[in-house]
């Protein structure tokens, strides 16, 4: 995380987790982030949801500035060398993607890019998972 703490997904078992892969230079990510803030993070953060933006391969100061510029309140984490990103996509693939993980730690939904219908489907899946 930006404050230097480390988070393991195993520590988040029992919560619905959304990993949002992002970068300050990714225009699609920047377009999606306000929607994640308003439509996912703010309504569900107190209902068992953890949303973590994972910034791909950028230095800490760049990511801090990026967080401030976007105005998001959900936590951002660093991904040096795109180590975590490469578990879900080829390192040279486009950045924008969300990985929704259920309370048991299983991947329940994946998105690519920012497309309205897919985003709505992701929100509905999150709502269902939170009720389980």
Question: What residue spans do the PLM features occupy?
Answer:
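Thiol/disulfide oxidoreductase modules built on the thioredoxin-like
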Residues: 68-73, 79-127
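Active-site acidic short loop of glycosyltransferases
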Residues: 12-15, 46, 73
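Conserved redox-active cysteine motifs that mediate thiol-disulfide chemistry
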Residues: 13, 21-38
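Active-site-proximal beta-strand/loop segments in catalytic clefts of secreted hydrolases
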Residues: 21-23, 54-57, 79-80, 111-112
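Structural microenvironment flanking redox-active thiols in thiol-disulfide oxidoreductases
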Residues: 30-70, 81-87
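A short beta-strand-turn-helix
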Residues: 1-17, 88
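Hydrophobic beta-strand anchors of alpha/beta hydrolase catalytic cores
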Residues: 18-19, 51
């Amino acid at each position: 995380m930006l404050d230097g703490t480390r988070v393991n997904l195993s520590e988040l078992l029992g919560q619905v987790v959304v990993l949002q892969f992002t970068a300050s230079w990714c225009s699609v990510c920047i377009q999606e982030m306000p929607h994640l803030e308003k439509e996912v993070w703010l309504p569900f953060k107190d209902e068992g949801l953890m949303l973590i933006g994972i910034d791909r391969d950028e230095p800490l100061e760049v990511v801090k500035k990026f967080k401030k510029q976007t105005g998001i309140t959900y936590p951002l984490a660093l991904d040096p060398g795109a180590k975590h990103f490469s578990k879900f996509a080829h390192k040279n693939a486009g950045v924008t993607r969300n990985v929704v993980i259920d309370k048991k730690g299983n991947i329940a939904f994946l998105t690519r890019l920012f497309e309205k219908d897919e985003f709505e489907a992701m929100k509905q899946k999150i709502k269902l998972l939170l009720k389980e």
